[in-house]
């Protein structure tokens, strides 16, 4: 399976100027990605922090984005456990993480989001994030690392002081 398309929608579009998108808090219809893409959105940011959206609904949304010219992203509620890896495994092109206050927390976030050598994300192949393909694992990890966007949210005085 060729992985050219897996280098990431956002990096390709950002190189041409700007990107636009929207937060998704409600209305998790599988038609939402197609509507947003036809309206010109480059990404959808699904919010797990402030909504009740779970992994099953997110899996449906990630699948609905597949094949469209739109990148699904997820704001996770925490880096605890394997939430970051799970949302990436189900097809998210990146994560936004709230309340990052220290350089150590930022490093941990990067470690969880990227495959070696950039990070230490656990491996899983032939699943949603690689379109259920059969490419060589090294190629899959490299493509995923190129595609993955990590956003650390600085929301506190402590976080700002540590920037």
Role assignments for model-derived ranges:
Residues 1-23, 134-148:
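N-terminal amphipathic alpha-helix/helix-capping segment at the start of soluble metabolic enzymes
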Residues 8-9, 55-81, 85-89, 113-119, ...:
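Alpha-helix-loop-beta-strand connector modules within alpha/beta enzyme cores
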Residues 14-30, 72-77, 148-162:
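Active-site mouth loops of central-metabolism enzymes
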Residues 22, 36, 47, 95, ...:
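Conserved, mostly hydrophobic/aromatic
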Residues 31-33, 38-60:
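Glycine-rich, proline-tolerant flexible connector loops at the mouths of alpha/beta enzymes
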Residues 39-43, 89-94, 114-115:
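Glycine-enriched alpha-helix->loop->beta-strand junction motifs that scaffold or abut catalytic
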Residues 47-49, 76, 97-100:
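Short beta->alpha connector loops at strand-helix junctions that form conserved
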Residues 82, 94-163:
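Conserved anion-binding
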């Amino acid at each position: 399976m060729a992985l050219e398309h897996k280098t990431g929608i956002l990096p390709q579009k950002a190189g041409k100027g700007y990107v636009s998108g929207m937060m998704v808090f409600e209305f998790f219809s599988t038609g939402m990605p197609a509507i947003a893409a036809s309206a010109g959105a480059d990404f959808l940011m699904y919010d797990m922090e402030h909504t009740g959206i779970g992994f099953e609904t997110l899996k449906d949304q990630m699948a609905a984005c597949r094949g469209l010219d739109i990148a699904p992203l997820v704001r996770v509620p925490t880096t605890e456990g394997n939430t970051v890896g799970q949302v990436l495994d189900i097809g998210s092109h990146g994560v936004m993480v709230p309340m990052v206050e220290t350089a150590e927390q930022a490093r941990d976030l990067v470690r969880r989001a990227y495959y070696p050598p950039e990070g230490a994300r656990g491996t899983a192949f032939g699943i949603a994030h690689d379109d259920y393909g059969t490419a060589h694992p090294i190629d899959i990890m490299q493509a995923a690392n190129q595609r993955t966007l990590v956003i650390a949210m600085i929301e506190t005085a402590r976080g700002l002081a540590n920037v």
